UniProtKB/Swiss-Prot annotation:
One of its GO terms (cellular component) is plasma membrane. This is Disulfide bond formation protein B. It comes from the Bacteria. HAMAP family: DsbB. GO terms for biological process: protein folding. The chain crosses the membrane at residues 14-30, 49-64, 72-89, 145-163. It is a multi-pass membrane protein. It is found in: Cell inner membrane. The lineage of its organism: Bacteria, Pseudomonadati, Pseudomonadota, Gammaproteobacteria, Alteromonadales. PANTHER family: DISULFIDE BOND FORMATION PROTEIN B. It comes from Shewanella amazonensis (strain ATCC BAA-1098 / SB2B).
Length: 169
């Protein structure tokens, strides 16, 4: 348990969180801009959740020895992973059970003080439809891969939450 506590209090653990989220964001932008796969509004919301994971990793990386910083990073990590998983599950449900009367919106519904799609449209403007499945790998859709990714983040958070919040030795 002590080695898990030491790892949870290290820059390495928070760096892995940040770098893995950065890799996911990079892949999303590659799919969008290089492969020309249009992201839907649910994809954009998941992208925001991944940015939350990136932010949590960077936040914890700044001062991993500080218990308050770790707690705030852990809070952002848990919220982002759970919210992302919820969104990925909803997207896969929309894709597997399309309903012409229940579609996703064309524009994201960000708060008025956080209009990401207007500030950075190349990253946050949805241009695709939620029911489209433009890409699969090993017979698994992108939405299903995101369920896997967010589940891993959530399971890692569950494994690390107690060691993260323990006092440093």
């Amino acid at each position: 348990m002590q080695s898990l506590i030491s790892f949870a209090h290290s820059r390495l653990s928070w760096g892995i969180l940040a770098l893995s989220a950065l890799a996911l964001e990079s892949a999303a932008l590659y799919f969008q801009h290089i492969m020309k796969l249009d992201p839907c509004v649910m994809c954009i919301y998941q992208r925001v959740a991944v940015f939350g994971l990136l932010g949590a990793g960077l936040f914890g990386f700044m001062a991993p020895a500080n218990r308050v910083i770790r707690a705030l990073g852990a809070l952002l990590w848990g919220i982002s992973a759970a919210w992302g998983l919820k969104l990925a599950l909803e997207l896969v449900d929309m894709q597997n059970n399309p309903n012409p009367f229940s579609t996703c919106s064309f524009l994201p519904e960000f708060p008025s003080w956080l209009q990401l799609h207007e500030w950075l449209p190349s990253v946050f403007m949805p241009t695709g439809m939620c029911t489209d499945i433009p890409w699969e790998f090993a017979g698994v859709t992108m939405g299903e891969w995101m369920i896997v990714a967010f589940s891993v983040y959530l399971l890692a958070w569950l494994a690390f939450i107690v060691p993260m919040l323990k006092k440093s030795a």
